[in-house]
Amino acid sequence: MNITVYLGANEGSDPALAAAVRELGSWIGANGHHLVYGGSRSGLMGLLAQSALDAGGTVTGVEPQFFIQQELQHDGLTELIVTRDMAERKTKMIELGDAFIAFPGGTGTLEEIAEVMSRVSLGQLDAPCILYDLNGYYDSLKALLDKMIEKGLSTPQRQRGIRFVANLEEITTILNKA
């Protein structure tokens, strides 16, 4: 299974985040899955890729040209796909993925997973869309989605493919059913 993971190029301030990233990367690699991610060697992105590689996995990085020019790419990847810009990167990462996971991240992570959430809710993408709600990070987003339903702006049916999870065990349960 190709698992696209969205997460930041920063490390964040919560040590539990780095531990969870390592755990997921190792699980992907050890279980014969293929990681698709943003291609950077920095922060959580680099940690995820290296964990998957160290566990024997294969990894595709998808990185826009302007990051290549800044020499931010991970040099040990199985494959590096260079895109013109962020929009093309986002499209390519969706094309390559069979399942999608968003770790806590910044505005880029939010933008990327929002595109997946939209496609899933519109029926244009039939794949797990998982938000890793580590230590309640995505609680406010979950509340917003619930508010959309409450106000008649969305439906439970449209949001049924969007899943919030608290740990790797919940992720693996979802992916094993996909």
Q: How would you describe each model-predicted region?
A:
Residues 127-135:
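Short loop-to-beta-strand entry elements in the cores of soluble alpha/beta enzymes
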Residues 90-122, 130:
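Active-site/ligand-binding-proximal alpha/beta "capping" segment
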Residues 1-96, 134-178:
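A cross-family phosphate/adenosyl-ligand binding-site feature
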Residues 53, 120-127, 153-154:
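Arginine/glycine-rich "motif VI" loop of SF2 helicases in the C-terminal RecA-like domain
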